[in-house]
A protein has these predicted regions:
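Short, solvent-exposed loop/turn segments at secondary-structure junctions
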Residues: 1-3, 111-114, 129, 147, ...
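Non-heme Fe(II)-dependent double-stranded beta-helix
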Residues: 2-123, 130-131
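Residues that flank catalytic or metal-binding motifs in active/ligand-binding sites
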Residues: 9, 78, 107-108, 136, ...
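Non-heme Fe(II)/2-oxoglutarate
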Residues: 20-21, 25, 45, 166-175, ...
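Active-site region of the double-stranded beta-helix
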Residues: 101-104, 126-133, 142-153, 159-162, ...
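Glycine-rich, charged/polar anion/phosphate-binding loops
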Residues: 124-127, 141-142, 200-202, 221-224
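Short, conserved beta-strand element in jelly-roll/cupin
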Residues: 132-149, 207-210, 215, 240-243
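Double-stranded beta-helix
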Residues: 149-221
């Protein structure tokens, strides 16, 4: 549980003491920062501006919100403690064992906070249309709180990674909305994500506790319920690892904030950029 305690400390720093952590980062000379979105404030603003917008609240569009729902993308790029967890911790070896890969690259992370009563669901989506990778990616979801069925459990459509389909990227605000085709984002021939329900799909939600890791293929359709608990916070990190002969790919469906500045071109080995180091095997120079 040592790494759980380590991750818990640094996630709390990101969520509750970000300004102090950023000040320390600035002293060290780092420049790029993660992109943080307060989904609670975003949803509240949209609800007031667009009455009737089908925002993904657990108890419907008129749900009363009592807590924060926050997501930060690429937090480990500026937060050294998170980066140490993702690179030096047990996850790279776990990915190598599960996938049978002889090479694993760290790709990126997101960190999530769902406070009691925050209500906001994470709409069903795939990770693949967001990632600048050609080749398989394993996604590790790591909770630092006990996760029950009432405080934001992860849900997965079993077998959906074998559908051989890539769907349009979700806007993460409404259940079936997609990122708009603007600022260079192009959906091409990607299909619209279907409405996901337990009646129509093999949908399973997982309870979890600190020390557990849920690993999914990047093409797996997944989402998370809203936190309707009155007492239980749900914090977690999602850590992404490319494996095998995965290479950089300038994916046109990838919107901000998932378009990292790297200097790479499609086909380059990921480790050509310091952003995507080889993290397994350990003797790769990391």
């Amino acid at each position: 549980m040592e790494w759980v305690t380590f991750l818990s400390h640094h996630l709390d720093e990101v969520f509750n003491n970000r300004e102090r952590a950023m000040d320390q980062r600035e002293v060290s000379g780092e420049s790029d920062t993660g992109v943080r979105v307060d989904m609670t404030a975003l949803a509240a603003g949209l609800r007031s501006k667009v009455p009737g917008l089908p925002i993904a609240f657990e108890h419907g569009p008129d749900a009363e919100i009592a807590g924060r729902s926050v997501v930060e993308t690429d937090a480990a790029h500026w937060h050294g403690g998170l980066r140490a967890h993702h690179i030096e911790g047990p996850l790279p070896e776990l990915v190598a064992q599960l996938t049978g890969s002889t090479k694993v690259n760290y790709y990126a992370d997101q960190v999530f906070l769902k406070e009691p009563g925050s209500q906001i669901r994470t709409p069903f989506h795939q990770d693949q249309p967001y990632f600048l990778v050609d080749g398989p990616v394993a996604v590790c979801w790591v909770p630092i709180d006990v996760v029950g069925l009432d405080n934001g459990p992860m849900g997965y459509v079993r077998g959906s990674h074998r559908w051989n389909k890539v769907f349009k990227p979700s806007d993460f605000v409404t259940d079936t909305g997609t990122f708009p085709e603007e600022n260079g984002v192009e959906h091409g021939d990607l299909e619209q994500m279907p409405a996901i329900s337990a009646a129509e799909h093999d949908l399973v939600y997982f309870e979890a506790e600190p020390g557990d890791v849920i690993v999914h293929h990047w093409a797996t359709i997944h989402g998370a319920a809203g936190n309707v608990s009155t007492t239980a916070t749900r914090r977690a990190a999602s850590v992404r690892y490319a494996h095998g002969d995965s290479r950089y790919y300038q994916r046109t469906s990838s919107p901000e904030p998932f378009r990292f500045t790297t200097g790479l071109v499609s086909g380059d080995p990921l480790e050509t950029s310091d952003r995507f180091p080889i993290v397994w095997p350990r003797d790769s120079g990391v």
